[in-house]
Amino acid sequence: MEKLLWCSLVMIGFSQAFAQKDMSKTAFVFPKESANSYVSLEAQSKKTLKAFTVCLHIFTELSTTRSFSIFSYATKNSPNEILIFWSKDRGYAFGVGGPEVLFKASEIPEVPTHICASWESATGIAELWVDGKPKVRKILQKGYTVGTDASIILGQEQDSYGGGFDANQSLVGDIGDVNMWDIVLSPEQINTVCVGGTLDPSVLNWQALKYKVQGDVFIKPQLWP
């Protein structure tokens, strides 16, 4: 009986653990609107951040229909510690530590789209790049430090640490090539990543990704080069 209980506990532990996998040429597919389907990511680095860059591919038809979350990084002190969010009729909202700036756009084209967002504490400069092309720079949270022990979620926006999901803000579509660095990538580096190059990501590495899938999320081949 004790042996059976021990085996059961081991199996539960495995089911709750983060898998690590090379996700090259694959994508997470969110096929329907939901408040309980998402992917949790585990950061390779647990340190606080004075700068960062997040890059990813997204493929969705939602942008002219409603708003949705692209990348959600929460800490216990701030559910929107880092947030990349599509705001219908407004554009890309990029938040650090709660406050956000808006990069205007009328839609996300209904083709696979590459997005990079970067920020640095020293100047507060926030940048957004779409398919290798920059938006006008903004200023955001100069002097701020991004916290650690993060809950990183794809597919949902966190209104609380690891939860508080709203189906009306969920992603429907594909997301992949999610990488994150603890530096601001240069324009040349952004363009290298945009065309499929690798730059040894220090926080999230798509080629050695630690993740957990919850609900109706599937891993399928990428629909972009």
From Swiss-Prot:
<feature type="signal peptide">
    <location>
        <begin position="1"/>
        <end position="19"/>
    </location>
</feature>
<feature type="binding site">
    <location>
        <position position="80"/>
    </location>
    <ligand>
        <name>Ca(2+) 1</name>
    </ligand>
</feature>
<dbReference type="GO" id="GO:0042310">
    <property type="term" value="P:vasoconstriction"/>
</dbReference>
<dbReference type="GO" id="GO:0032677">
    <property type="term" value="P:regulation of interleukin-8 production"/>
</dbReference>
<feature type="binding site">
    <location>
        <position position="157"/>
    </location>
    <ligand>
        <name>Ca(2+) 1</name>
    </ligand>
</feature>
<dbReference type="GO" id="GO:0032945">
    <property type="term" value="P:negative regulation of mononuclear cell proliferation"/>
</dbReference>
<keyword id="KW-1015">Disulfide bond</keyword>
<dbReference type="GO" id="GO:0001849">
    <property type="term" value="F:complement component C1q complex binding"/>
</dbReference>
<feature type="modified residue" description="Pyrrolidone carboxylic acid">
    <location>
        <position position="20"/>
    </location>
</feature>
<dbReference type="GO" id="GO:0006953">
    <property type="term" value="P:acute-phase response"/>
</dbReference>
<feature type="binding site">
    <location>
        <position position="159"/>
    </location>
    <ligand>
        <name>Ca(2+) 1</name>
    </ligand>
</feature>
<keyword id="KW-0106">Calcium</keyword>
<dbReference type="Pfam" id="PF00354">
    <property type="entry name" value="Pentaxin"/>
</dbReference>
<dbReference type="GO" id="GO:0045087">
    <property type="term" value="P:innate immune response"/>
</dbReference>
<keyword id="KW-0732">Signal</keyword>
<dbReference type="GO" id="GO:0032930">
    <property type="term" value="P:positive regulation of superoxide anion generation"/>
</dbReference>
<feature type="disulfide bond">
    <location>
        <begin position="55"/>
        <end position="116"/>
    </location>
</feature>
<keyword id="KW-0964">Secreted</keyword>
<dbReference type="InterPro" id="IPR030476">
    <property type="entry name" value="Pentaxin_CS"/>
</dbReference>
<dbReference type="GO" id="GO:0050750">
    <property type="term" value="F:low-density lipoprotein particle receptor binding"/>
</dbReference>
<dbReference type="GO" id="GO:0010888">
    <property type="term" value="P:negative regulation of lipid storage"/>
</dbReference>
<feature type="binding site">
    <location>
        <position position="169"/>
    </location>
    <ligand>
        <name>Ca(2+) 2</name>
    </ligand>
</feature>
<dbReference type="InterPro" id="IPR013320">
    <property type="entry name" value="ConA-like_dom_sf"/>
</dbReference>
<feature type="domain" description="Pentraxin (PTX)">
    <location>
        <begin position="24"/>
        <end position="225"/>
    </location>
</feature>
<comment type="similarity">
    <text>Belongs to the pentraxin family.</text>
</comment>
<dbReference type="InterPro" id="IPR051005">
    <property type="entry name" value="Pentraxin_domain"/>
</dbReference>
<feature type="binding site">
    <location>
        <position position="159"/>
    </location>
    <ligand>
        <name>Ca(2+) 2</name>
    </ligand>
</feature>
<dbReference type="GO" id="GO:0010628">
    <property type="term" value="P:positive regulation of gene expression"/>
</dbReference>
<dbReference type="GO" id="GO:0042802">
    <property type="term" value="F:identical protein binding"/>
</dbReference>
<keyword id="KW-0873">Pyrrolidone carboxylic acid</keyword>
<keyword id="KW-0011">Acute phase</keyword>
<dbReference type="GO" id="GO:0010745">
    <property type="term" value="P:negative regulation of macrophage derived foam cell differentiation"/>
</dbReference>
<protein>
    <recommendedName>
        <fullName>C-reactive protein</fullName>
    </recommendedName>
</protein>
<feature type="binding site">
    <location>
        <position position="157"/>
    </location>
    <ligand>
        <name>Ca(2+) 2</name>
    </ligand>
</feature>
<dbReference type="InterPro" id="IPR001759">
    <property type="entry name" value="Pentraxin-related"/>
</dbReference>
<comment type="function">
    <text>Displays several functions associated with host defense: it promotes agglutination, bacterial capsular swelling, phagocytosis and complement fixation through its calcium-dependent binding to phosphorylcholine. Can interact with DNA and histones and may scavenge nuclear material released from damaged circulating cells.</text>
</comment>
<dbReference type="GO" id="GO:0005615">
    <property type="term" value="C:extracellular space"/>
</dbReference>
<dbReference type="GO" id="GO:0030169">
    <property type="term" value="F:low-density lipoprotein particle binding"/>
</dbReference>
<dbReference type="GO" id="GO:0005509">
    <property type="term" value="F:calcium ion binding"/>
</dbReference>
<feature type="binding site">
    <location>
        <position position="158"/>
    </location>
    <ligand>
        <name>Ca(2+) 1</name>
    </ligand>
</feature>
<keyword id="KW-0479">Metal-binding</keyword>
<comment type="subunit">
    <text>Homopentamer. Pentraxin (or pentaxin) have a discoid arrangement of 5 non-covalently bound subunits. Interacts with FCN1; may regulate monocyte activation by FCN1.</text>
</comment>
